[in-house]
């Protein structure tokens, strides 16, 4: 049972292709259902890992990667299909690339990067998930109207920028306060 959160996370990774394929095929209701299943699995694996202390190094890596792959895939595809604006897609992808590269550089130069996701990062992930679910719901049933989605896109954009800024500031502080490790 200890590895159940990792299995759920792998299940979420496996759902990315069917969500993307059904979205591309215009099967918006099915795509939304699969996407909601993926989003619920994100909450479930985190809950189980914390509640039963089933955390692992693999899970600490796999969970955020699954989130990033799911969200980046769907943002890019949704923009390509004309369902979301490119500007929010560019912001979401740029934020995730910046965080990924920042973490990689920190690890290579300074060693392991310890810490927990910031509250603003969790809010951002929730906003992105809700925004994309709203976009798919709108594509499936014609509601909510475009103006509501545009307003939520702005709210989501603000969380992307605030979260990106928070990570940039955090990485910068850690870089200045951590001595570089000698190269081997």
Where are these regions (language model features)?
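Alpha-helical transmembrane bundles and membrane-interface segments of multipass inner-membrane proteins
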Residues: 1-184
């Amino acid at each position: 049972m200890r590895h159940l959160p990792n299995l759920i996370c792998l299940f979420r990774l496996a759902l990315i292709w069917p969500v993307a394929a059904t979205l591309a095929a215009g099967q918006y209701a099915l795509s939304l259902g699969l996407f909601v299943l993926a989003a619920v699995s994100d909450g479930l694996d985190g809950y189980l890992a914390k509640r039963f202390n089933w955390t692992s190094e693999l899970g600490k890596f796999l969970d955020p990667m699954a989130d990033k792959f799911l969200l980046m895939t769907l943002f890019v595809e949704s923009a390509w299909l004309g369902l979301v604006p490119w500007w929010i897609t560019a912001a979401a992808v740029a934020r995730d690339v910046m965080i990924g590269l920042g973490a990689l550089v920190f690890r290579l130069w300074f060693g392991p990067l310890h810490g927990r996701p910031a509250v603003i990062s969790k809010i951002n992930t929730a906003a992105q998930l809700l925004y994309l679910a709203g976009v798919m719901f709108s594509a499936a049933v014609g509601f909510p109207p475009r103006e509501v989605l545009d307003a939520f896109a702005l709210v989501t954009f603000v969380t992307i920028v605030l979260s990106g800024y928070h990570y940039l500031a955090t990485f910068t502080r850690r870089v200045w306060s951590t001595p570089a490790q000698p190269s081997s």
